[in-house]
From Swiss-Prot:
Biological role stated in the UniProt entry: Required for spore wall assembly and ascus formation. Involved in the formation and elongation of prospore membranes.
Major subcellular site: cytoplasm
Statement: the UniProt record of this protein carries the keyword Disulfide bond: no
Name of the gene encoding the protein in the UniProt record: SPO73
Source species: Saccharomyces cerevisiae (strain ATCC 204508 / S288c) (Baker's yeast)
Protein name: Sporulation-specific protein 73
């Protein structure tokens, strides 16, 4: 388990929260970010789960993350609301400006110079993170 230096107030977050991590390099003046250049044994894995009870970050292996279709971190065809008797579908969404506390860019990324830093901003940095939350979806079908 890793320490959480990123999310300070997680009391109002949903139960299912994932943190996506990437490292970047600058090539010919353009920043390029990818999870493939995360440094082993230095950086966290590409995905971490937030334990909303104590705020710790739990590493997720690549085998846990099964599908990246439509930019969702987990396969949605089998995802259901946990502990619910109904079979309500849920979707993963990027958390955008949670309670106006975070300085993020238009795609939900926060940037910093390293992952252990407590200061994250909407631009400039060697590493970046974004938060995914799983929320129930409503059906608006015409029956």
């Amino acid at each position: 388990m890793g320490k959480n230096h990123f999310l300070k107030d997680f009391s109002a977050l949903p139960e299912d929260v994932l943190i996506e991590n990437e490292r970047g390099i600058t090539l010919l003046g353009y920043p390029l970010f990818s999870p493939k250049i995360l440094l082993p044994h230095v950086d966290p894995p590409q995905f971490q789960r937030l334990n909303t009870e104590n705020g710790s970050l739990i590493a997720l292996s690549k085998n846990t993350i099964s599908n990246f279709i439509e930019l969702y971190p987990i396969d949605l065809s089998t995802e259901r609301t946990a502990g619910s008797s109904s079979s309500q579908m849920t979707k993963w969404f990027v958390l955008m400006d949670y309670k106006e506390k975070y300085d993020i860019d238009d795609q939900g990324w926060c940037y910093s110079w390293n992952f252990n830093n407590s200061r994250w901003k909407s631009k400039n940095g060697l590493v970046r993170r974004r938060v995914w939350v799983r929320l129930p979806t409503t059906s608006h079908g015409l029956d």
